[in-house]
Regions:
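Transmembrane helix-loop junctions and nearby membrane-interface residues
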Residues: 17-24, 113-120, 143-146, 150
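Small-polar-interrupted transmembrane alpha-helices in polytopic inner-membrane proteins
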Residues: 8-16, 92-118
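Interfacial helix-loop-helix junctions of multi-pass membrane proteins
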Residues: 47-64, 110-135
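Membrane-interfacial, low-structure loops and terminal tails that flank and connect transmembrane helices
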Residues: 84-96, 151
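Hydrophobic alpha-helical transmembrane segments
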Residues: 61-84
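N-terminal signal-anchor transmembrane alpha helix
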Residues: 2-30
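Hydrophobic cores of alpha-helical transmembrane segments in multi-pass inner/ER membrane proteins
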Residues: 70-77, 133-149
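Extracytosolic (periplasmic/ER-lumenal) interhelical loops and adjacent juxtamembrane/interface segments
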Residues: 22-62
Length: 151
């Protein structure tokens, strides 16, 4: 199950630039792929042009922060799958560690959002993506550790 979750994270992260490339091609079969990825991206993200990265002269299917979340999840999935198995820990220890990891990883993103709301100044897309990478990696790590602990 962990392999499925990790594979899904990597595939979705890879689909984002692939969809931008397919949109730039503007051809038949690639068009369906583009519609699917941008459609799903639109269901989970605001897709604001000014808050999105552009690749191949096309806006990515999700904003910079979401791109960071998914890239972080994919990186964590690859890292998690490549490391040796750790010894089992109790569910309560795992839950406590997960809560702390997620709280600490969410701090940069939360600080960025609070800064944006209180000043009206918008951080750069690179800064938005960086905060997403941290939280995305932590979330993926927690999910994969939880899936791994059930085996």
């Amino acid at each position: 199950m962990g392999l499925v979750v990790a594979g899904a994270a990597v595939l979705w992260a890879a689909a984002l630039p692939a969809a931008a490339y397919a949109a730039a091609l503007d051809s038949g079969p690639a068009h369906l792929f583009t519609l699917a990825v941008y459609g799903f991206g639109g269901a989970i993200c605001h897709q604001r042009d000014d808050r999105s990265f552009h690749l191949f002269a096309e806006q990515l299917p999700v904003c910079a922060r979401c791109t960071g979340l998914y890239a972080g999840a994919a990186l964590a999935a690859v890292w998690y799958g490549s490391r040796p198995r750790l010894t089992r820990v109790s569910p309560s220890t795992l839950a406590t560690a997960a809560r702390w990891l997620l709280a600490v990883a969410a701090l940069p993103l939360a600080a960025s959002v609070v800064y944006e709301w209180t000043t009206g100044d918008v951080p750069s897309n690179l800064a938005r993506a960086a905060t997403g990478i941290v939280l995305g990696a932590a979330v993926a790590h927690v999910i994969l550790a939880a899936v791994d602990s059930t085996r």
